[in-house]
Amino acid sequence: MTAGTRTVVLAANSLWYITNFRTGLVRALRDAGYRPIVVAPADPKNEGRLAELGIEFVPIKIDRKGLNPIVELSLLSRLSRLLRRLRPSAYVGFTIKPNIYGAVAASRLRIPVIANVSGLGTAFIRRGALQRTVTGLYRIAFRRAVVFFENADDRQLFVDRRILRPEQARLVPGSGIDLDSFVVADLPSDETIFLLIARLIGDKGVREFVEAARSLRQRMPHARFQLLGGIDEGNRTSIQKPELDAWVHAGVIEYLGETDDVRPFIAKASAVVLPSYREGLPRSLLEGAAMGRPLIATDVPGCRDVVDEGVNGFLCESRNPVSLADAMWRLGSLPEQQRSSMGAAARRKVQEQFSEALVIRAYLNALAGLQRN
């Protein structure tokens, strides 16, 4: 494999992330004359999806949640060797460890860096030694990087903590939504279904969703509350299977498992819900909005960027199942025409502010700027 002046390495902690959220960007890079090379842990299923697109893939071992310093230094070493061999014209990092260690490795080799902070995650939500450690690592890694943020709150936090300079930080509307893939579906007229799409971790507000559903059983006896997403064993706030099974057994929620295609589930839902503690720019809300679904979310960074109170949905207080239940009750009590109007407003907002084309243009412009410099 030879190095090329137009090679761009894109790295993430899972190949699933790239194939589900960044395929449009990878294709656009290829079509613009770049040679994109994706770097992530081995994943035969998603490697096949990349191969179908004719995109090169290099597997690398990443312990997504581990904090062992020896293991972390080993990852830095592997990324350094890989980038020294490929000598790309730019390194693009997604997710926390490829962002930090990839940026450090690339900077040492004088390879320009673009990093994407798609949310601050558990390390920033929960204060303490871990937050201080991650802040310090970001400060080292992003010294010379161009950094894309998905909401203004996260951008300002990094600037205020002097992790980076204001001129390094740019806003981009998430990973963008392919509006040709996510099309409007008619709202169900015969039942009310609230759908939460998320990894099963506490920080996504899963327990608040369950408690809100439990409290609404008498007021809304015919409403259904559905949970779609996989158990994230490695996360410190992960929901464990016995707890999930108890909710299902009690008839509080329906668990739909996990999927690579959320569209059929959104099409059957009346509203998409996300009671998260903090987000970058929540894709589940954007996908629901693109399909014409009213939204219910917490009034926190990321979520409030997508939901306009009373226009395309309702906001509620974070970590407050009573407030969440009230928002779901308000939406469920609306006449069908008003729900449809909210769904139409949600779709328009995605078209105007969050389309994939806007995101791709931002990355191509950033790469062109790096080439000029």
Where do the language-model regions lie?
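Glycosyltransferase donor-sugar binding loop
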Residues: 39-45, 197, 224-239
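Conserved donor-binding/catalytic core segment of Leloir-type glycosyltransferases
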Residues: 186-204, 210-214, 226
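Aromatic "clamp/platform" in nucleotide-sugar-dependent glycosyltransferases that forms part
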Residues: 258, 277
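Short hydrophobic beta-strand element within catalytic cores of glycosyltransferases
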Residues: 294-297, 307
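Conserved acidic donor-binding segment of nucleotide-sugar-dependent glycosyltransferases
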Residues: 308-310, 314-321, 330-336
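A short, well-ordered alpha-helix in the C-terminal region of glycosyltransferases
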Residues: 330, 337-353, 359-362
